[in-house]
Amino acid sequence: MGSEMCIRDRNILGYRPYADDVVDYFVQKSISNGIDIIRIFDCLNDLRNLQEAVNATNKFKAQEGRGEAQVALAYTLGDAYTLEYWTSMAKKIEEMGADSICIKDMAGLLVPYKAAELIKAMKEVTKLPIQLHTHYTSGVASMTYLKAVEAGVDVIDTAMSPFAMGTSQPATEVMVETFKGTPYDTGLDQNLLAEIADYFRPYRDECLANGLLNPKVMGVDIKTLLYQVPGGMLSNMVSQLKEQNAEDRYYDVLKEIPKVRKDLGEPPLVTPSSQIVGTQAVFNVLLGERYKMATKETKAVLRGEYGQTVKPMSQEVIDKVIPGEERITCRYADLLDNEMDKLEGEMKEWKQQDEDVLSYALFPQVATDFFKYRQAQQEKVDMTQADTKNGAYPV
């Protein structure tokens, strides 16, 4: 295994859909800067949104001999998400040219025996390596990994013990010890792993002390299994209700979430669909009328800008929220013009290296502030104080 990064389909690391030429350039520069595996997922599991990143990875691999495209399927529950659905997706991923598959269980919903069933079924239809990524939020992740490994999964994602468990992954050391002396023995040295854990433990303590790491995310939250809601989505929902002095409506919102999810075509609850569904559920409850106010993201989902959902969206909600609007049935990126030349022109005064344009594309305000800071450090001139129009600088 080499270094790996995760990108969100055509949104890459940002918050809007980017044209294909931006996706292509980002993948190229990621691999040339040392990333070996590009893990690509889509919040709707719409494979059309992933094809360009897979193509870009394969193109660079053909040229340079490096880079692996791993397509991640967002795991979720619902009557549409059958074994046949998952095996069909696995076959399509192999056909689209991916090098491996990741089952991305962001909410910790995949329980042990279902994991074994899923892995066995997918292994029967694809020769691609399968990697499993889950979270300990619901408390079953280690057992899920055990059954998945026994069923033939190729790779499991873990975290070093100081930052494991809770909303993170099972501890690396625990899984290494679990498989020691079995056909699945990793061969990893526990003494060396202990040194790594000792290195990171003070950072964990520092994060706890300064509030960067909330103790609440370090335990088990069984509500994840009951409501099928990822831990991060619950935290975000609580914050929204607290801001509105409406924490007493918590369970009302929890009941509304599956209704909104159904209205929007039953998408997996993963970034950004989890935030879209959660925020809309809060609005529906607090305003006393469903879809009295719809967020711009909810409208975009209903228009089809995010892609195709596994089930049809509610026509009643479509008629109420975006009455008379034309809906998109093609891949949304097909409607976008290439952007690289435009982006290069907008930030040319700051460009010092090729990667700068990608920083600007993904995080324009943050990147611009950094470019100004970098120039100030290099030239000892604070551009926020300079009067560039009159060529003056305060002394």
Report residues per predicted region:
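General structural feature for long, well-ordered alpha-helical segments within catalytic domains
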Residues: 22, 26, 46-49, 53, ...
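Terminal or standalone catalytic/regulatory effector modules within metabolic enzymes
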Residues: 214-224, 228-395
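Catalytic alpha/beta core domains of metabolic enzymes, predominantly
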Residues: 106-291
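Alpha/beta enzyme core
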Residues: 11-12, 16-132, 145-153
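Short, small-residue-biased leader/transition segments that mark boundaries at the very start
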Residues: 1-7
